[in-house]
Design a protein with these regions (language model features):
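Extreme N-terminal starter segment of soluble prokaryotic enzymes
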Residues: 1-4
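Short acidic, Gly/Ser-rich segments with clustered Asp/Glu that frequently serve as metal-coordination loops
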Residues: 10-14
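Glycine-rich nucleotide/cofactor/substrate-binding loop typically near the N-terminus or early
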Residues: 16, 39-94
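Short catalytic helix/loop segments, enriched in acidic residues and glycine
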Residues: 19-44
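Short, basic, glycine/proline-bearing loop/turn elements
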Residues: 25-29, 70-75, 121-128
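N-terminal glycine-rich phosphate/adenylate-binding segment common to multiple enzyme folds
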Residues: 78-122
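Active-site glycine-rich loop that binds ribose-phosphate moieties when present
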Residues: 83-84, 121-146, 152-155
């Protein structure tokens, strides 16, 4: 059985400024390593349940996670493919039984995280059914559309 794990960075433990989430900035390597540690922990937990894990590196350049730091039951999808799935690129109903998320953050209108946004900082807000939608909400609906249940979420407290 397989878990599809979408990993972002703005909800990673301790992160609180944009330069910490931006490749090439001074503190970015520390938080990319923290993102990797959180992803690895989720993969180890999934492994204890007998699950193989495909991790979608879903932040910025999509090359933030160190694949060598992940357990044997995990593989990483790096880079972007141009499709509607975006942060869920690679997900399909025939390959995965479960979906999980690490490092996710609250929506653009939330004050729960200094890095709150939805998809891009250029959008003031994204609304779904009359309510502000976070990337987690949008991506969880995408999994639901495929009939794949969400079993795990880690990120900021405002989610």
């Amino acid at each position: 059985m397989k878990l599809f794990l979408s990993a972002d960075i703005e909800g990673t433990a301790g992160i609180d400024t944009w330069d910490e989430a931006t490749p090439g900035e001074r503190m970015y390597p520390y938080f990319a390593a923290q993102m990797t540690r959180e992803v690895a922990a989720a993969c180890r937990a999934a492994g204890k349940l007998g699950l193989d894990v495909t991790v979608k590196d879903a932040h910025d350049i999509a090359r933030n996670i160190d694949p060598s730091a992940l357990p044997e039951n995990a593989s990483v999808l790096r880079g972007w493919i141009r499709d509607l799935y975006c942060m869920m690129g690679g997900l399909d109903r025939d390959s995965y039984e479960y979906v999980g998320f690490t490092g996710y953050h609250s929506d653009a209108v939330s004050d729960g995280n200094p890095l709150s946004h939805t998809m891009t900082t250029g959008l003031q807000r994204v609304m779904l059914n009359g309510k502000p939608a976070s990337e987690f909400v949008l991506n969880a609906y995408m999994a639901g559309m495929l009939g794949i249940p969400v079993i795990f979420l880690s990120g900021d407290a405002a989610l």
